[in-house]
């Protein structure tokens, strides 16, 4: 493919509105262009990368018997009313009317559509299982699109749906998809973790998220590629190294979610779902009597603890939530933070929000800072974190402004439902007892769910079982964010390329180091002087030889300065660069491996053989 024939509008500077490196490089390297807020055009390079990823997916899904189809993006609102999601999905749903004033939506996901198609066509358990998927643009009216392709209003997604006559059959397909996803993301060159996830608006119970890890850019050996003109990091002057470190740190670490994972086992979970090892403790101290104490001007746990000279771990944090219009009191040990996802899931609530100061005062008779679980109205629902039941003689709010109660003992002074509703902390023991928890940021690239009968129940999707009884179809759902794969790969494979000029100056610039499986082309073939006929002829021969061996080749045939060609090559990020330069008449070309910065001169006749050796090594 001739570079002069492609639309690759590279920029000399990073875009000023980009906050994450993937967004900046996709724009600067000519992969994407924003058409309007949250809506992007995928230019030829991005489209080739996405198509390569689609090929990987199709190959892996074929192995597990998944069949591709295509559903409409424009959906009747009646389907979503049938499932109940038309009203509950929220403001992110694109709603529109046709000329007949009928309601439609632009699909953000397609559970209802696939459920309807199968409901109308499948009548017996003998027709199951079915395993269907599509690759399609989706739509979500994001309030604040940001970070390039990570949070957009239009995005490309692979969504799959499986249909079963029982849960045992669903379990088999769910495991097939889990393994297929691991194979897909491994082939794509991603550093990822499969983690315990939350089903959220999708419904369902068991779910697993696949998160591309986005580590901090502190490891120079990982993030910096040195040109052959620089022997090692030690050769770079200290002040230049400091500039390089500052440049690495200048870009925000992307990743919507925090992951908690074990240092010594396979345990990993979204922070919203993460838990830790818990061991109930036996009470050894005698229980004191309740005593009301004045705590003037103390509104926070740390202020109360300091005023009463107690540790924060001996205090009870009392919060009030409204769950589906009902008040719920939540209790935590004072130095812990509430995990609202855990609380919402435990309550099986559709809506959960913190109560206002006015609602708290109406319920407790006091304002924030003085709330507590003692002497609440009969029938009050109290959900306490499991650590609270280990407390003896704790401090809690007295439900009286400016006062607290000491000597509070769970069981004696209040009754509660005990469950894990706290946010875990780094360094705590993993729930499997192996290793401690560490945190990392991550980008969600895939999510699989066991939906069960969530949609078949609401939409009447039933089959006749072995006993001719009508039973709901059991479903699974499997998504991959195709367009955000591009962002995730660049976040992990962006590199700062450093070189030394003949005058001894150090220069550095960002570029992409694409893994081979997803690079838009395998080889960047550059002719230094397009007016040199010998070089042109050698380039044409090498291009033909490479393509005959199955390499995708991007040939830079532009009449541009060699410096511009090399800069664009670093930006675009193909794994291999072959330069036909001053030694073309001698049949000598230069090979550069992008990942390491290593380069070597070889006879053009040995190019293919040398590339095969080098690519095996790297």
Curated annotation (Swiss-Prot):
Catalysed reactions listed for this entry: tRNA(Pro) + L-proline + ATP = L-prolyl-tRNA(Pro) + AMP + diphosphate
Gene Ontology CC: cytosol
Any one GO biological process: prolyl-tRNA aminoacylation
Subcellular compartments: Cytoplasm
Gene: proS
Quaternary structure, from the entry: Homodimer.
Natural source organism: Streptococcus pyogenes serotype M2 (strain MGAS10270)
Listed GO MF terms: aminoacyl-tRNA deacylase activity; ATP binding; catalytic activity, acting on a protein; proline-tRNA ligase activity; transferase activity
Comment, domains: Consists of three domains: the N-terminal catalytic domain, the editing domain and the C-terminal anticodon-binding domain.
Enzyme Commission number(s): 6.1.1.15
Protein name: Proline--tRNA ligase
Pfam families: HGTP_anticodon, tRNA-synt_2b, tRNA_edit
Domain of life of the source: Bacteria
Keyword tRNA processing recorded: no
EC main group: ligase
Function noted in UniProt: Catalyzes the attachment of proline to tRNA(Pro) in a two-step reaction: proline is first activated by ATP to form Pro-AMP and then transferred to the acceptor end of tRNA(Pro). As ProRS can inadvertently accommodate and process non-cognate amino acids such as alanine and cysteine, to avoid such errors it has two additional distinct editing activities against alanine. One activity is designated as 'pretransfer' editing and involves the tRNA(Pro)-independent hydrolysis of activated Ala-AMP.
